[in-house]
Regions:
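Acidic, Ser/Thr- and proline-rich intrinsically disordered linker/docking segments
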Residues: 1-57
């Protein structure tokens, strides 16, 4: 199980990389991250930056 750190304006998240289901661009250079079995989280950064972070794992 590989955790990735995602930064948010309200705090930071540690997410299991394999549980990320989808990414959606949001306003103000933020991205929604869909997590299997949970509600989406809103993180800081463009969709490309978040995708690169997840793939680098």
């Amino acid at each position: 199980m590989k955790f990735i750190s995602l930064k948010s304006r309200g705090g930071n998240y540690l997410v299991v990389a394999e549980n990320v289901a989808w990414l959606r661009a949001h306003q103000n250079d933020q991205t929604q991250v869909g997590v299997i079995g949970g509600a989406p989280i809103l993180v800081a950064g463009s969709i490309e930056d978040i995708a690169a972070t997840i793939l680098a794992g």
